[in-house]
Swiss-Prot record:
Subcellular location: Nucleus
Motif, Nuclear localization signal: chain positions: 81-95
Feature: compositional bias, Polar residues: 280-295, 303-324
Protein name per Swiss-Prot or TrEMBL: Polycomb complex protein BMI-1-B
Keyword annotations: Chromatin regulator, Metal-binding, Nucleus, Repressor, Transcription, Transcription regulation, Zinc, Zinc-finger
PANTHER family: POLYCOMB COMPLEX PROTEIN BMI-1, RING FINGER DOMAIN-CONTAINING, POLYCOMB GROUP COMPONENT
Primary location recorded for the protein, binned into one broad class: nucleus
GO terms (BP aspect): cerebellum development; negative regulation of gene expression, epigenetic; negative regulation of transcription by RNA polymerase II
GO CC term (a single one): PRC1 complex
Region (Disordered): 232-324
Subunit architecture: Component of a PRC1-like complex. Homodimer. Interacts with cbx2.
Alphabetized GO MF terms: promoter-specific chromatin binding; zinc ion binding
Amino acid sequence: MHRTTRIKITELNPHLMCVLCGGYFIDATTIVECLHSFCKMCIVRYLETSKYCPICDVQVHKTKPLLNIRSDKTLQDIVYKLVPGLFKNEMKRRRDFYAEHPVDATNGSNEDRGEVSDEDKRIIADDEIISLSIEFFDQKKLDGKDGEEKESTKEVTVKRYLQCPAAMTVMHLRKFLRSKMDIPCTFQIEVMYEDEPLKDYYTLMDIAYIYTWRRNGPLPLKYRVRPGCKKIKLSSPRNDMSGGRRPDTESDSSSDKPNSPSIVAAPSTSSSMPSPNTPVQSTHPSFPHISTINGVSAKVGHNGQTPFSSKVCKTSHNGSNSLG
């Protein structure tokens, strides 16, 4: 299973920090001309005395530079999600500020005042408690005609409700289900969102971000139990009927020993080799004077003798050669 690549937040800091104040983006604002981003308060104060970008010196606007900057909500959400505790601390700072200055609180939105309801929260902290529901995944409900779910009145699926930290992984949830339901290790447990299996390294925070959970109810999860995969041993291929050499993929017990030579079965020649009194038949019916000796085509002379150049050379044990 391929895991996601984890990198340190310090490696992303150049893309998440404002060059004017040296901190993480708060109310990220981007210049339209060059797409460089800064904190809203930082870039507004800077453009009061300059009409050029602080990074690349591109002219923002000739007379009114504030017309060419835009609020970047996407970038701000990324910063809040990547930096732990930043959103929570920023909302607390805003509430404390507007508590001391109640007159200014009427002009801003709820997020500007730091008063964000649970339904409007887009950021989830690591230590936050998430409510979730988990139930058995019934495949039969999805097998209805024309993709419609079957309404089963006989069987009612029981939901279980849990409160878990946002940093808890799917693997921990699987172990919890296995221990509570006494599921043997020979069976596999899959945790799912709707009909899609979830990775073991997903946290509840990841699931909420990926599937855009809006906090309008418990995080709906499902599970199913499957029998474990059995390891099947592949049988090695048999030797051919001709008694040829065994294939390399077959394990040979004699080859595993360092001092035992590998034995190769030689083909039987009792039925295939002709006897000395049997005349050699030609493999060329159109040319009966051509025959084959030891696989080599040889010509026979007028007197029925094989020429000297076509005779077979035999080697004896003492190294002396003789002609057949």
